[in-house]
């Protein structure tokens, strides 16, 4: 098991936490992380782009003028894709970009992401981060004491005061253990775990 210093809100070491090797110390494969991040981003796409085809644009379907004898090129209706304001051929239509990756691969990628943070010395543990009230200034002061910028904070409960205190701080995000995901872990430079959240995270892989 890997031992990590547990800090208080002033950035001082108060104890040690031990992280399970099967979750925080596994070999990292960039290809697996890439596949899962790509899947997450694909699921976020709205897929709402839409253009009108010739059957959907407004206008008459009558032939504009006779086929022969005018000296002009032959022409059909005003809705032809060849004309200004006509329909679009093979234009975009609403669709879902979401696709699935096996559950075991997603779980493996999450463990790899956690392991990569520990290996890069970008994982920190704090004993508690509970806020008595919604105070953005106080939250920012704690982050400064910890020396962490661009940080993902993982909590094990619904701490409304903490979430709202962090909301306006740029490059800081607070999520619960249930929402922990590969994309957010890799997006932020630092990962800060509440000490009580460690067991919750490790428990996700033993259920």
Swiss-Prot record:
Positions of region (Disordered): 43-80
Annotated Gene Ontology cellular component terms: ribonucleoprotein complex; ribosome
Listed Polar residues bias regions: 69-78
Example GO molecular function: rRNA binding
DNA-binding as UniProt keyword: no
Pfam families attached to this UniProt entry: Ribosomal_L4
InterPro entries in alphabetical order: Ribosomal_uL4, Ribosomal_uL4-like, Ribosomal_uL4_dom_sf
Paired cysteines (S-S): none
GO biological processes: translation
Keyword flag Transmembrane: no
Keywords for this protein: Ribonucleoprotein, Ribosomal protein, RNA-binding, rRNA-binding
Quaternary structure and partners: Part of the 50S ribosomal subunit.
UniProt-listed PANTHER family: 50S RIBOSOMAL PROTEIN L4, LARGE RIBOSOMAL SUBUNIT PROTEIN UL4M
Function: One of the primary rRNA binding proteins, this protein initially binds near the 5'-end of the 23S rRNA. It is important during the early stages of 50S assembly. It makes multiple contacts with different domains of the 23S rRNA in the assembled 50S subunit and ribosome.
Family, per entry: Belongs to the universal ribosomal protein uL4 family.
Name of the protein this chain belongs to: Large ribosomal subunit protein uL4
The gene coding this protein: rplD
